[in-house]
Amino acid sequence: MEDIQIEHPRPIPIFYCCYLLRSTVRHASLYIGSTPNPARRLVQHNGVVKGGARRTAAEKLRPWEMLLVVEGFTSRLAALQFDSAPAEVKHRRKRKAKSGDPESLDSNCDSAKTKDKGTPKKSKRRPRPPRSLDTHFSDLHRLLRSTYFSHRPLKIRFFSGDIYQSWKAWYDRVDVRLRSPVKVILDGSCPEIGAHASGNDTRFGGVENAKITYATIQDYIEKAIFLLDDPKDVRCHVCQGQIVPKEELTTVCPQAECHCTCHLLCLSRKFIDAAEEPNQIVPRHGICPACEATVEWPLMMKELSFRSRAKQELLEILKRKRRVDRKQSVVTGKVESSSRRSVSVDLDDRFGQDAEDEFLLDEDWWDGLASESDSDADRRLKTLSKAAPKLETVIEDSECDDAEIL
């Protein structure tokens, strides 16, 4: 019997998204997938490097362009569920029609005519009708309104100006509005000023500049480590109780000048109570009890997950800090900021911008995560609980087996 490998928990990914591709040769050809690295995934789909999908491999359709991404997923599983949801709905409808609908059974019997010697005639399989851009907009709209995804801090980032205008025109015709305001970011070729262009301060400038590494919150992680390294007087700003960082999950305010620390449960309860949403289980944002700034809950959880799960990297950072502290104790005239700068220089080596090392974790985990981002809908969820050995990268399609490229 093979040994069962147990995968240790990893930090929450800084960036994970579902994306929509369009062929620049034939605009009716669209493709959906999910990835933690959109720039690398686009290069794979265009055949520059290995690892593309079968349905984007046709040279007559290349190159592909990335039209939009839905970002803000806190796990690979959540992104895959969002990616595969439309295909799963179609599968359930087909199974229901085959098993429980008498009319469908009668129609099947009528269509099965007999030939000579009573041999039944095989019915030809109808090709799936092309899924238009409006159909993808409808799927996106339905998923964002669903109970499961409407409470997540998801954002829509448009890289194509004409696609944003198409979405805007389509959404204006829809009677049902989204349950909560979804942040829309205009990026790439989209204009920077628009009626719904909220969050343009977070523009990447293009898919190739997507911020997908923990280097984006380096200062935040460093500040939290400094605050909690000497927990003699670390208290919760909600319950005023003593905090033991090594034994309790502790949140730190992401504001640079704020030193607020709280118990995880205390702060989450405070945020949920302030939101006054009866069905909310996980907060989206809240007001810091110390500096009173609005802070994003997912950002705080990413920092906390790194601090509590990336043990090896955390120990290396602390060792550097303590070496600097020892040197500082024998050198006079040094200010605290110089110590912070010295540690920052060392941290830059650990927070490199290389996409292969963006999580500061082992390479096998990151490569496996990226290579499995476009697996088939019927197989993807079954393989999540199994630890796969390192094999040659094989990328399959993001949609179901009977789907066809448009």
From Swiss-Prot:
Xref: Gene3D superfamilies: GIY-YIG endonuclease, Zinc/RING finger domain, C3HC4 (zinc finger)
Chief place where the protein resides: nucleus
Location of region: Disordered: 88-136
Superkingdom in the source lineage: Eukaryota
InterPro entries assigned to the protein according to its UniProt record, in alphabetical order: GIY-YIG_endonuc, GIY-YIG_endonuc_sf, Slx1, SLX1_C, SLX1_endonuclease, Znf_RING/FYVE/PHD
Record flagged with keyword Transport: no
Domain GIY-YIG: 14-98
Keywords: DNA damage, DNA recombination, DNA repair, Endonuclease, Hydrolase, Metal-binding, Nuclease, Nucleus, Zinc, Zinc-finger
Subcellular location: Nucleus
Function comment: Catalytic subunit of the slx1-slx4 structure-specific endonuclease that resolves DNA secondary structures generated during DNA repair and recombination. Has endonuclease activity towards branched DNA substrates, introducing single-strand cuts in duplex DNA close to junctions with ss-DNA.
Subunit structure: Forms a heterodimer with slx4.
Name assigned to this protein: Structure-specific endonuclease subunit slx1
Natural source organism: Neosartorya fischeri (strain ATCC 1020 / DSM 3700 / CBS 544.65 / FGSC A1164 / JCM 1740 / NRRL 181 / WB 181) (Aspergillus fischerianus)
Gene that this polypeptide is encoded by: slx1
